């Protein structure tokens, strides 16, 4: 197989150029890549086409690059199928199917959401005991205490900063 490459704008001209060189078994045009893949039935015709395309340009003057690539990149000559590793035979045919219908009389129940409680019960009780208690231990470092005032003149909660 030969791969002809030019700019994507000149792919149609490249395809016509490839068709005129020698009889082609089939071609594939890759517009976005600016490539034409051409396959030939005869190796001698393929080699002749490679020599003819060495001029390096289309009739419009656009550069053309031609490369020879193997038709089957996985084929290695000299190794038969008997010498290569074979896929093992299937012992069982595994069938993955959806689950069956629910049993007769089954009714769906409404379940509680998974995170209905944010904290464990014992931790929540201890926090409720603390309430708005102010810890007066100033030796532990700086503290920030936020509390609400019942004063109607102040609309935002006051903040106490202690050092």
Swiss-Prot record:
Family matches, as InterPro entries: Calcipressin (IPR006931)
Residue runs in coiled coils: none
GO aspect biological process, one term: calcium-mediated signaling
Cellular component, GO annotation: cytoplasm; cytosol; nucleus
Domain of life of the source: Eukaryota
Chain intervals for the UniProt region annotation (Disordered): 142-163
Biased amino acid composition, Polar residues: 153-163
GO molecular function terms attached to this record: calcium-dependent protein serine/threonine phosphatase regulator activity
Entry-linked PANTHER family: CALCIPRESSIN, PROTEIN SARAH
Family as reported in the entry's similarity comment: Belongs to the RCAN family.
Function summary: Inhibits calcineurin-dependent transcriptional responses by binding to the catalytic domain of calcineurin.
Protein name as catalogued: Uncharacterized protein C13G6.15c
Source organism of the structure: Schizosaccharomyces pombe (strain 972 / ATCC 24843)
Taxonomy of the source species: Eukaryota, Fungi, Dikarya, Ascomycota, Taphrinomycotina
């Amino acid at each position: 197989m030969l791969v002809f490459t030019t700019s994507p704008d000149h792919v149609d001209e490249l395809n016509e150029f490839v068709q005129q060189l020698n009889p082609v078994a089939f071609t594939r045009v890759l517009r976005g890549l600016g490539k034409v893949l051409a396959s030939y039935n005869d190796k001698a015709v393929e080699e002749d086409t490679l020599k003819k395309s060495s001029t390096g340009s289309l009739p419009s003057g656009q550069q053309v690059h031609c490369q020879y690539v193997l038709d089957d990149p996985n084929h290695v000559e000299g190794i038969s199928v008997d010498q290569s590793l074979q896929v093992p035979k299937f012992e069982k045919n595994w069938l993955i199917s959806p689950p069956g219908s629910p049993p007769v009389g089954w009714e769906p129940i409404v379940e509680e959401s998974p995170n209905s409680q944010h904290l464990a019960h014992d931790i929540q009780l201890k926090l409720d005991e603390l309430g708005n208690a102010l810890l007066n231990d100033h030796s532990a470092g700086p503290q920030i205490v936020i509390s609400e005032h019942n004063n109607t003149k102040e609309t935002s909660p006051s903040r106490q900063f202690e050092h």
